[in-house]
């Protein structure tokens, strides 16, 4: 028997981001966020969409990017932003997928910051990275290669941080899926478990409208590819086929 699960909450509407984030303060009573994002999104100011809203509701935050060294806080010693950490020996893989070093570094930052919210803000690779960062944050001794190879049982969620996925591109739907890929030079580790599933997904067209035209085209093709693949997969169900056809 196959089962199909999605995040506990899925917001799907143009302009829904502010409404969804209000839950953090007023319903979930959360106060400290670690944002995982793409360095290009940060440098081009797209992350301000998110951080401005967090400032409005009084949720403090730090930002961690795929370059590992971009660690920023909303509460520096004085006004403005300041770098609070750098990861020695950090590297960025040529692969579009996150690598082990990056997710281990992100988990290390999470253990220092002790956030009660983890927010993935970016494309599928950022969301995949955040899934594994959360896994390692809650289970510091977890061995990702061993888990991927089935040599070690998948550790359960421990609830240290509420996990929100906010996609900035269209693609494989990582924000509502229990999968993640971690790439090394000679190997890709594929993880599959509902323990990786975000607690909330926020799909806001206003966020995706910030994409440049070239990325919009590429991510649209990616979404089409994944929808076709999901429809013809031997593991598809009546439910997933309907979703794929609508995509």
Task: Label the predicted regions.
Residues 1-28:
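N-terminal amphipathic/basic leader segments beginning at the initiator methionine
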Residues 10, 17, 43, 47, ...:
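Generic structural signal for well-ordered, non-membrane alpha-helical segments
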Residues 18-34, 55-56, 82:
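Glycine-rich phosphate/diphosphate-binding loops that line cofactor/substrate pockets in enzymes
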Residues 34-53:
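Glycine-rich phosphate/diphosphate-binding loop of Rossmann-like nucleotide-binding domains
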Residues 37-38, 66, 166-168:
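Cofactor-binding loop segments of dinucleotide-utilizing enzymes, especially the Rossmann-like FAD-
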Residues 47-142:
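N-terminal small/polar loop signature for handling phosphorylated ligands or for N-terminal nucleophile
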Residues 98-205:
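Glycine/threonine-rich beta-strand-loop-alpha-helix active-site module
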Residues 179-247:
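Carboxylate- and glycine-rich phosphate/diphosphate-binding segment that chelates Mg2+/Mn2+
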């Amino acid at each position: 028997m196959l089962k199909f699960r999605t995040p506990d909450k899925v917001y799907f509407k143009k302009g829904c981001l502010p409404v969804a984030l209000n839950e953090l303060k007023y319903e979930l009573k959360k106060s400290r966020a670690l944002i995982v994002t793409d360095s290009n999104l940060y440098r081009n100011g797209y992350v301000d969409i998110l951080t401005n809203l967090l400032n409005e509701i009084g949720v403090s935050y730090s930002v961690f990017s795929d370059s590992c060294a971009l660690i920023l806080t909303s509460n520096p010693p004085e006004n403005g932003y300041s770098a609070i950490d750098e990861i020695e020996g950090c590297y960025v893989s040529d692969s579009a997928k996150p690598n082990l070093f990056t997710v281990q570094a992100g988990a290390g930052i999470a253990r220092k910051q002790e956030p009660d919210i983890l927010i993935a803000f970016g494309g599928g690779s950022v969301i995949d990275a955040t899934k594994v960062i959360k896994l390692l944050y809650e289970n510091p001794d977890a061995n990702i290669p061993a888990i991927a190879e089935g040599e070690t049982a998948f550790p359960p969620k421990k609830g240290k941080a509420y996990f929100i996925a906010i996609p900035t591109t269209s693609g494989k739907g990582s924000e509502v899926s229990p999968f993640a890929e971690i790439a090394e030079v000679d190997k890709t580790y594929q993880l599959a478990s509902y323990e990786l599933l975000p607690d909330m997904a926020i799909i806001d067209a206003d966020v995706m409208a910030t994409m440049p035209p070239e990325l919009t085209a590429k991510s649209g093709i990616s979404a089409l590819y994944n929808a076709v693949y999901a429809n013809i997969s031997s593991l598809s169900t009546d439910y997933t086929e309907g979703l794929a056809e609508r995509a």
